[in-house]
Amino acid sequence: MANSKRLFGVVRRKLLRRSQSRITIIRSSAPETTREEIAAVKIQAFFRGHLARRAFKALKSLVKLQAVARGVLVRRQARIALHCMHALARLQVRVRARQLLSH
């Protein structure tokens, strides 16, 4: 058990040294970002966020418009169906009255 712990520690230290050297190389080869580049990235991010919010707002208003239009259509269909049901009820009353009078 003690040997495996020691071996694990040795391997871990070697890996850490390798990863640290890689990190150093990567950092030294990457160009440093200037304040202007950071500011430009922030401005671009804010502008993209603005465009996304504007597109979302337009989509939301379009969905509301669709809901209103569909509501108008449904109310119209309900009114027509109710009118037809009343007409059928009146017709049914007339037919039954005729049947009673003819008997």
Swiss-Prot record:
Q: Name one GO cellular component term.
A: plasma membrane
Q: Which family does it belong to?
A: Belongs to the IQD family.
**Which keywords does this Swiss-Prot/TrEMBL entry list?**
Calmodulin-binding, Cell membrane, Membrane, Nucleus, Repeat
Indicate yes or no for the key word Repeat: yes
Q: Does the keyword Repeat apply?
A: yes
Oligomer status and interactors: Interacts with calmodulin (CaM and CML) at the plasma membrane in a calcium ion Ca(2+)- independent manner, however, Ca(2+) seems to modulate calmodulin binding. Binds to multiple calmodulin (CaM) in the presence of Ca(2+) and CaM-like proteins.
UniProt protein name: Protein IQ-DOMAIN 20
Protein role = May be involved in cooperative interactions with calmodulins or calmodulin-like proteins. Recruits calmodulin proteins to microtubules, thus being a potential scaffold in cellular signaling and trafficking. May associate with nucleic acids and regulate gene expression at the transcriptional or post-transcriptional level.
One Gene Ontology MF term: calmodulin binding
Q: Which organism is it from?
A: Arabidopsis thaliana
Question: What's any GO biological process attached to this entry?
Answer: response to calcium ion
Gene3D superfamilies according to UniProt: 1.20.5.190
Q: Name one Pfam family in it.
A: IQ
**Region Calmodulin-binding, residue ranges:** 10-22
Occurrences of domain IQ (ranges): 36-62, 63-87
